[in-house]
UniProtKB/Swiss-Prot annotation:
GO terms for biological process: translation. It comes from Guillardia theta (Cryptophyte). PANTHER family: RIBOSOMAL PROTEIN S9, SMALL RIBOSOMAL SUBUNIT PROTEIN US9M. GO terms for cellular component: chloroplast; cytosolic small ribosomal subunit. The gene is rps9. This is Small ribosomal subunit protein uS9c. The keyword Chloroplast applies. The keyword Transcription does not apply. Keywords: Chloroplast, Plastid, Ribonucleoprotein, Ribosomal protein.
Length: 134
């Protein structure tokens, strides 16, 4: 489905362990993630749907482009935020003038917080075993 599209703009987003490749094509506002309708993939959560389409809403282009996404890794929230970043980057390729509005809203900033590694001698990343004085 993505291969035969005439004009498409792509953007990649990362969040935690999630990676999303977003393909933007002229259309009617459809969103499709991994070949599944967006509403079904996001479990009919209005918050997830709103978050993933928020860059389009900011620019007033909700029903002008279809969004096709390949997402893998992480959980649903991480994937939604990766989709949002990828969509914002694709919109910048579409029209460089969109960059200022998207940057102002913070959609072009990659959230760099990732899981801290577990250290030896500790139970988790920071949790130490119980200390006994005697």
């Amino acid at each position: 489905m993505i291969e035969n599209l005439k004009t498409n703009y792509t953007g990649t987003g990362h969040r935690k362990q999630a990676i999303a490749r977003v393909y933007l094509t002229p259309g009617s506002g459809l969103i499709e993630v991994n070949g599944i309708k967006g509403e079904l993939y996001f479990q009919y959560s209005p918050n997830y749907i709103r978050l993933s389409k928020s860059p389009l809403t900011t620019l007033g282009l909700e029903n002008k482009y279809n969004i096709y996404v390949n997402a893998h890794g992480g959980g649903l929230t991480g994937q939604v935020e990766a989709i949002r970043l990828g969509l914002a980057r694709a919109l910048c390729k579409l029209n460089p003038e969109n960059r200022t509005a998207l940057k102002f809203e913070g959609y072009l900033t990659r959230d760099s917080r990732i899981t801290e590694r577990k250290k030896y001698g500790l139970k988790k990343a920071r949790k130490a075993p119980q200390f006994s004085k005697r």
